A protein has these predicted regions:
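A structural detector for beta-sheet-dominated domains
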Residues: 138-141, 165, 187
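Short solvent-exposed strand/turn elements
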Residues: 179-197
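Short, ordered beta-strand-loop transition motifs
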Residues: 79-80, 175-180
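Flexible, small-/acidic-enriched active-site or ligand-binding loops
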Residues: 143-167
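Short glycine-/polar-rich loops that comprise or flank the Walker A/P-loop
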Residues: 133, 167-168
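Internal glycine-rich, Lys/Arg-flanked active-site/core loops of soluble domains
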Residues: 1-152
């Protein structure tokens, strides 16, 4: 069993049950552990690697979690929060730097098909990158309702997590060697994926 921080309160118009379910799903998404405690690996591996942007099967656990996470992000979205820059740290061996260099040179956009955990805190993201890792620096449009600050509902609130919806599109603005890590600078391209639940 796990404890839930925060409440979606007034944001959930159909009562406390929806609020509780969305808080639970956000907490499970940010939790560490096996699939009973944590869902982020299962959800993102399936969305990003197996489905590659396709919709989850109807009435599956994946569809349930995808719908609830999308709903939570949309309910928590606040254009007044002014979240213009977020960071994502990834171990170096997990990122194809040449892919991003090619996309920058060809001016082609990149799309991330899974939910993406980012942070408002550069240092928190650098901790995830580790030595020789990659730091994504993402400039976003604060009016684009495709990300939300979820730190209040997280198992790790100090990480200052901002969750991005799947199917986000970015322009690659730079790939830079910063000595201890590589920095990939992305600019979010505002759009609204029509197929998301």
């Amino acid at each position: 069993m796990y404890l839930v921080r925060g409440s979606l309160g007034g944001a959930a118009r159909d009562g406390e049950m929806r609020s509780r379910v969305l808080c639970d799903v956000l907490y499970k998404y940010t939790a560490e552990g096996d699939r009973r405690k944590s869902i982020y690996k299962h959800v993102n591996n399936t969305l990003g690697k197996l489905l590659k942007g396709a919709q989850p099967k109807r009435r599956s656990g994946l569809e349930f979690y995808t719908q609830k996470l999308v709903m939570a992000v949309r309910l928590l979205f606040d254009s007044n929060a002014g979240i213009r820059k977020v960071y994502r740290g990834v171990r170096g061996e997990l990122v194809d730097l040449e892919f991003y260099r090619e996309k920058q040179q060809s001016r082609e956009q990149v799309q991330w098909n899974s939910f993406t955990s980012t942070s408002m805190a550069r240092d928190a993201a650098l901790n995830f990158a580790g030595g020789g890792g990659v730091l994504f620096v993402i400039t976003r449009d604060p009016e684009h309702a495709a990300a939300a600050d979820i730190h209040e509902y997280s198992q790790f609130p100090n990480e200052q997590e901002v969750l991005l919806l799947p199917m986000q599109v970015f322009d690659v603005q730079g790939v830079h060697d910063r000595g201890g890590h590589t920095e990939i600078v992305l600019r979010e391209v505002p759009h609204y994926p029509a197929e998301l639940p």
